[in-house]
């Protein structure tokens, strides 16, 4: 599940898994594992995780484990063991039916239903062209402008990226700033 933490934290919960093997690695947008709930790491008990984005300030409700994502978006890849029989599939499906993701403001309510956010049908680039062609069509300024926007609130650079961010700043690629291609002479552009 892809999760947008831009508006508020999300609560991820799963039931007691009994003796069933399961794994829920959780990734930031940069793709390192930031938490890994599962049989080996957290045991079989039911759990609730409060997934928070960058800069979130608040109180973690009792009984929840906070998972701090350094990026606005994160990913959970759930895996639950099944032995391949119909009977076991039914047992797995019953467990999966209890996996839940809810905004923190709606956690604990019984009448909450998910309404997907509107999808932007025009992200400003082709969704069908090859990635290389999309990048070329953006042009130098467009590419570095997009990079600066993405490194702003959605996926701020990690502290360990400071050396490369400092080098990029020397040529004008800075998180949250528009790229000034005009600062370079024509030969450099």
Where are the predicted features?
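A compositional/structural signature for long, glycine/proline-rich flexible linkers
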Residues: 1-189
């Amino acid at each position: 599940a892809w999760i947008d933490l831009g508006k508020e934290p999300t609560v991820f919960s799963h039931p007691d898994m009994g003796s069933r093997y399961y794994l829920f690695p959780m990734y930031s947008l940069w793709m390192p594992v930031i938490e890994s709930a599962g049989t080996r790491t957290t045991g079989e008990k039911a759990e609730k995780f409060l997934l928070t984005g960058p800069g979130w300030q608040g109180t973690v409700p009792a009984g929840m484990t906070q998972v701090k994502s350094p990026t606005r978006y994160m990913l959970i890849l759930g895996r639950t063991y099944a032995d391949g029989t119909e009977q076991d599939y039914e047992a797995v499906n019953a467990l999966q039916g209890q996996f839940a993701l809810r905004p923190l403001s709606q956690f604990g309510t019984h009448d909450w239903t998910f309404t997907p956010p509107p999808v932007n049908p025009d992200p400003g680039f082709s969704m069908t062209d090859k990635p290389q062609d999309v990048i070329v069509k953006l042009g130098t300024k467009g590419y570095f402008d997009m990079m600066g926007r993405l490194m702003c609130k959605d996926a701020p650079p990690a502290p360990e990226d400071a050396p490369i961010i400092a080098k990029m700043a020397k040529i004008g690629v800075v998180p949250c700033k528009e790229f000034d291609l005009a600062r370079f002479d024509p030969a450099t552009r």
